[in-house]
C-alpha cells in the first residue's frame, strides 16, 4: 500500500531517496529520479506480461551494470507481435496497469518505423496532475536474436521498503546486444552515407568486454545475422575485418565524451587507451577467428 498521502509527498520522498543514493553512487540526483520513473514503467510492462517482452538498449545495460551509461530511452522487443500495431496495443495495456504507486504513464503520439520495424512513441510520466518526465520508447518487432534471453530481478535504483512489487525483467540476449552495437557502429547513413557517430556503442561494448563472458561462435553468428537484417532493410553496412573507428576525425573527441559517461568503464577514457581492448575483443569477431569464450579477466578469446 502506498504510504504517501499525496503526490507531493511521494515526489519529496523520491527526491530524498535520490539525494541519499547520489552520495553513495556519485550519480546526479535528477538521473536517479528519472531512473526510478523508468523502472516503475518497466514494472508495469513485466507485471502485465512477464514473458511477452525483452528489454534492450541502454536500460538493459543498466539492469546488468548499475553504473553503466545513463539512458533516456526504453527499447523493447515484442517477439510475438505480427505487426507494430500489435506491439503498440500490448504496450498501451501494460502502461495503463495501476500498481498503486501514484504514477500514471500517458502515451502521446506514435510513429511507425519504416518496413515494419516497430514504433516510436513518447510517454509522459504523471505524478498526480504534474508531468515529471517524458520517456522516449522504441518498440521493435522484426528482430531475430540467436542467443537466449535472460530473466533477472529488477533491482530498484532507489532502495526502500516501498514499492516492493519489483518483477523480474527479460533481457535481450547479450550476444545479440553485442551484435547490434557492432553493426550500429559501422552502418553508414544517407545523405552522403555519413559515417556512424555511435560513440556510445564502443563505450558500451568495452564495458561488456570488461564484465562478461561470451561464446565466440554464437556471437559471430549473431553479428552476421544482424548485418544481414540491416542490409535487407536497405542499410549500408560493410563490416571491417579488424577494429577501426568509422571516422578518425570525429571519433577521438566523440568517444572520449561517451566514455566519460560510463562510470563503470575502467581504463578506456580515450581511443588510445581503449584500442588494445577493442582490438582484442572485436577483431576476432569481425574476422571470424574468435574461438571458445571471451575471458574478461584475461581480455582474450580462448
Task: Please name every model-derived segment.
Residues 1-53, 62-74, 78-302:
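Structured mid-to-C-terminal alpha-helical surface segments
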Amino acid at each position: 500500500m502506498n504510504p504517501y498521502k499525496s503526490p507531493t509527498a511521494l515526489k519529496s520522498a523520491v527526491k530524498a531517496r535520490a539525494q541519499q543514493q547520489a552520495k553513495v553512487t556519485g550519480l546526479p540526483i535528477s538521473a536517479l529520479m528519472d531512473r526510478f520513473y523508468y523502472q516503475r514503467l518497466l514494472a508495469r510492462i513485466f507485471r502485465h506480461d512477464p514473458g511477452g517482452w525483452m528489454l534492450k538498449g541502454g536500460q538493459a545495460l543498466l539492469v546488468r551494470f548499475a553504473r553503466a551509461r545513463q539512458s533516456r530511452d526504453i527499447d523493447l522487443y515484442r517477439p510475438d507481435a505480427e505487426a507494430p500495431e500489435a506491439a503498440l496495443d500490448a504496450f498501451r495495456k501494460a502502461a495503463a496497469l495501476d500498481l498503486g504507486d501514484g504514477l500514471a504513464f500517458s502515451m502521446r503520439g506514435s510513429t511507425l518505423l519504416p518496413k515494419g520495424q516497430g514504433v516510436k512513441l513518447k510517454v509522459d510520466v504523471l505524478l498526480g496532475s504534474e508531468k515529471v518526465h517524458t520517456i522516449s520508447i522504441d518498440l521493435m518487432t522484426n528482430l531475430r536474436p540467436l542467443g537466449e534471453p535472460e530473466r533477472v530481478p529488477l533491482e530498484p535504483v532507489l532502495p526502500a521498503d516501498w514499492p516492493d512489487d519489483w518483477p523480474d525483467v527479460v533481457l535481450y540476449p547479450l550476444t545479440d546486444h553485442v551484435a547490434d552495437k557492432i553493426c550500429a557502429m559501422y552502418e553508414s547513413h544517407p545523405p552522403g552515407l555519413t559515417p556512424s557517430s555511435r560513440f556510445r556503442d564502443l563505450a558500451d561494448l568495452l564495458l561488456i568486454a570488461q564484465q562478461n563472458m561470451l561464446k565466440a561462435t554464437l556471437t559471430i553468428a549473431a553479428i552476421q545475422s544482424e548485418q544481414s537484417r540491416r542490409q535487407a532493410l536497405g542499410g549500408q553496412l560493410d563490416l571491417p575485418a579488424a577494429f577501426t573507428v568509422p571516422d578518425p576525425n570525429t571519433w577521438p573527441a566523440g568517444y572520449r565524451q561517451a566514455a566519460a559517461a560510463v562510470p563503470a568503464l575502467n581504463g578506456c577514457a580515450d581511443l588510445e587507451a581503449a584500442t588494445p581492448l577493442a582490438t582484442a575483443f572485436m577483431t576476432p569477431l569481425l574476422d571470424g577467428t574468435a574461438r571458445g569464450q571471451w575471458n574478461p579477466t584475461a581480455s582474450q578469446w580462448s
